Amino acid sequence: VYNHTAATDNSNLNLAVPNYYYRQNSQGCFSNGSGCGNELASERSMVRKMIVDSVIFWASEYHIDGFRFDLMGVHDIETMNQIRAAADEIDPSMYIYGEGWSAGSCAYPTEKLAVKANTPQLHGIGAFSDDMRDALRGPFSDDTKGALLAGIPGEEESLKFGIVGGI
């Protein structure tokens, strides 16, 4: 995944350029929008380059024809659009989509992140529908909310919307 790394302080990225590759919150601590202890600062030029270049490599060398971005909402819109542009140069039919949310608060303005509410700004990039998922089985965080598969009412409109593809 591109939204976080296993280590932060002692990661190769942080050892190479301290405090550059990871976002920090207003207290100077590493931000945790990934829910895994850190989040990459995709809006920074060298982080963006690393992500875009690796997608180009995977697509060119291994003929990968689609990419799914875990917690895409941690990434900035510009980086995601640059990924799409780079992918289009290789194969315009390449499929790119991701989860339009984060796992926590990000240390970057929400209006600049690739979250579900901002998908109109993501050109040629889809977002997974957690609304449809939650309507079918219920949200991760609340077992009492509506879910068709559990026989709990309350999400019928979300299901209808999801079934027709949000048209």
Residue ranges: model-predicted function:
Residues 63, 84-167:
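Conserved alpha/beta catalytic core and glycan-binding cleft of carbohydrate-active enzymes
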